[in-house]
């Protein structure tokens, strides 16, 4: 089933998945391709050229195409592949993921990994503060309503690096603040892209019965108090002050139109954003993952 694999996009996650697929011991004769805009493939910019050369060095073929194309144009490309993995999520216009799923169905692709590397949208449910979540739930309905394309959704939680984004605010290295969202006991699952790539590649080449279902992986699952404790352990107690952004505070941020306020509110509720590591694919398969304590070893204070 995985003889001809197309990954959509070569951003942080796409590159991590491509590298893991290329290096997987069960790759055998599987052909790997990555969908990139022709302008990216033919770019003379040093960084772009370096990236293309790196991917080609791993035996990955650039496939010209653009996810902004029409459904039928995308289907014409997808028709040549057995497995498609969508890593085109961040910053894409509303409706892009629905169009990609429709193109996959139209092309008759055998297996699809949609861009759902994040929260468990079934658990969050419709009507949240984030409209894009409703689109993801509707895509799940589409997948479940058909039987021609096998699908797998890999729920990963938040990218671990997002904890350190200033707008998200959980670990602010510049202000030396750790924050809880909702309550200090609310939990969050976080995973680094490299580990997402490794586990996804393992599912692609060795599914072990995983099909037409949502699976979970986790680098770490912690409460915000546990996150703050690990930050203190790394940088010394008293270096960071603690601040709680409860639901009332986050609702004010939402009303003020603050950046990523919808996401913070979702994580503060704690539904569909955290799961026990014991029930994850990585634990079942004995795949070692990067936890927050280990990740923090490479994090330094902003001077």
From Swiss-Prot:
Inducing or repressing factors: Expression is induced in response to 2-benzoxasolinone (BOA) exposure.
Domain of life per record: Eukaryota
Annotated binding of NADP(+), by residue: 8-14, 36-39, 56-57, 77-79, 159-162
EC number(s) stated in the UniProt entry for this protein: 1.-.-.-
Disulfide bonds: none
Keywords, ordered alphabetically: NADP, Oxidoreductase
Keyword set includes Oxidoreductase: yes
A GO MF label: oxidoreductase activity
Pfam families associated with the record: NmrA (PF05368)
Catalytic EC class: oxidoreductase
Misc note: Fusarium verticillioides possesses 2 unlinked loci, FDB1 and FDB2, necessary for detoxification of antimicrobial compounds produced by maize, including 2-benzoxazolinone (BOA). The FDB2 cluster arose as a duplication of the FDB1 cluster with rearrangement and expansion by incorporating additional genes.
Function: NmrA-like family domain-containing oxidoreductase; part of the Fusarium detoxification of benzoxazolinone cluster 1 (FDB1) involved in the degradation of benzoxazolinones produced by the host plant. Maize, wheat, and rye produce the 2 benzoxazinone phytoanticipins 2,4-dihy-droxy-7-methoxy-1,4-benzoxazin-3-one (DIMBOA) and 2,4-dihydroxy-1,4-benzoxazin-3-one (DIBOA) that, due to their inherent instability once released, spontaneously degrade to the more stable corresponding benzoxazolinones, 6-methoxy-2-benzoxazolinone (MBOA) and 2-benzoxazolinone (BOA), respectively.
Family of this protein: Belongs to the NmrA-type oxidoreductase family.
Protein name as catalogued: NmrA-like family domain-containing oxidoreductase FVEG_08287
Species in which this protein is naturally found: Gibberella moniliformis (strain M3125 / FGSC 7600) (Maize ear and stalk rot fungus)
């Amino acid at each position: 089933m995985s003889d001809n694999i197309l990954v959509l996009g070569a951003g942080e996650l796409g590159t991590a998945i491509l590298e893991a697929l290329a290096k997987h011991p069960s790759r055998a004769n599987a052909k790997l391709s990555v969908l990139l805009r022709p302008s990216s493939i033919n770019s003379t910019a040093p960084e772009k050229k370096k990236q293309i050369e790196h991917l080609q060095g791993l035996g990955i073929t650039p496939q010209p195409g653009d996810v902004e194309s029409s459904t039928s144009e995308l289907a014409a490309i997808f028709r040549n592949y057995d497995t498609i993995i969508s890593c085109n999520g961040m910053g894409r216009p509303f409706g892009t993921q629905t169009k990609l799923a429709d193109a996959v169905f139209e092309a008759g692709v055998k297996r699809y990994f949609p861009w759902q590397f994040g929260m468990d949208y079934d658990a969050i449910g419709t009507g949240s503060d984030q409209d894009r979540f409703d689109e993801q739930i509707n895509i799940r309905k589409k997948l479940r309503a058909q039987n021609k394309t096998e699908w797998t959704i890999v729920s990963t939680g938040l990218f671990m690096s997002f904890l350190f984004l200033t707008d998200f605010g959980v670990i602010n290295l510049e202000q030396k603040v750790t924050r809880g969202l909702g309550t200090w006991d609310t939990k969050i699952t976080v995973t680094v892209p490299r580990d997402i790539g490794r586990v996804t590649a393992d599912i692609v080449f060795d599914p072990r019965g995983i099909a037409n279902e949502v699976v979970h992986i986790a680098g770490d699952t912690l409460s915000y108090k546990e996150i703050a404790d690990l930050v203190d352990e790394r940088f010394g107690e008293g270096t960071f002050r603690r601040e709680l952004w409860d639901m009332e505070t986050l609702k004010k941020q939402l009303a003020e139109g603050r950046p990523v306020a919808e996401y913070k509110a979702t994580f503060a509720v704690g539904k569909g954003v955290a799961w026990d590591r014991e029930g994850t694919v990585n634990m079942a398969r004995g795949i070692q993952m990067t936890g927050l304590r280990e990740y923090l070893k490479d994090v330094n204070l902003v001077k």
